[in-house]
Amino acid sequence: MGAGALGVVAMVAAAVVVAMAGANSEGDALSALRRSLRDPGGVLQSWDPTLVNPCTWFHVTCDRDNRVTRLDLGNLNLSGHLVPELGKLDHLQYLELYKNNIQGTIPSELGNLKNLISLDLYKNNISGTIPPTLGKLTSLVFLRLNGNRLTGPIPRELAGISSLKVVDVSSNDLCGTIPTSGPFEHIPLSNFEKNPRLEGPELQGLAVYDTNC
């Protein structure tokens, strides 16, 4: 075998190693999530941590490079809490965990998911504040956090996400005022309702941000 052919083989082998390493780290992150969840219906039985990559697991979608791009875990009767390891899924585009009984807080590490398009955590039992780090999600289009127990203000950092089209934080316990700049100019007020302590400049004139937080 010539030097050129050997070089090609080495490059292919290196690419395979890199792909496997990425898949393993993503598998580790998903295994951490599984350990933190209670799964009475056994919907995560296929999540076998001994496999080389998680792309064969149910409710997980991967791209052609075997990188996880989508988690479809909505409405599966899951409970437990989210884990910071989710922030290692750096190719993830869709995180769907709506209509479960997820508790605890939103990990600030989710702000590392630079390719995330949709973050759907609505209708759970999530508490704590909305992490300002979500403002780093520059590809985000859909942010649905309604129907939880979130407190604190709506982070101003979210107003800097130019791609954001849908924001729904209704039915929480948020406080302060509703941002009106950037994408928030076009978000209907109904997407902020049922937050008794949340005020909107549209209703209050020139309200000062975080007036009652």
Swiss-Prot record:
Signal peptide region: 1-21
LRR repeat segments: 90-113, 115-137, 138-161, 163-186
Pfam families (alphabetical): LRR_14, LRRNT_2
Superkingdom per UniProt: Eukaryota
Keyword annotations of the record: Cell membrane, Endosome, Leucine-rich repeat, Membrane, Plant defense, Repeat, Signal
Chief subcellular location: membrane
A single GO cellular-component term on record: late endosome membrane
Biological process per Gene Ontology, one example term: defense response
InterPro entries: LRR_dom_sf, LRR_N_plant-typ, LRR_R13L4/SHOC2-like
Membrane topology category: Peripheral membrane protein
Protein localization: Early endosome membrane; Late endosome membrane; Cell membrane
Induction: Up-regulated by wounding and upon pathogen infection.
UniProt function note: Involved in plant defense response.
UniProt subunit comment: Interacts with HIR1.
Protein name: Leucine-rich repeat protein 1
Native species: Oryza sativa subsp. japonica (Rice)
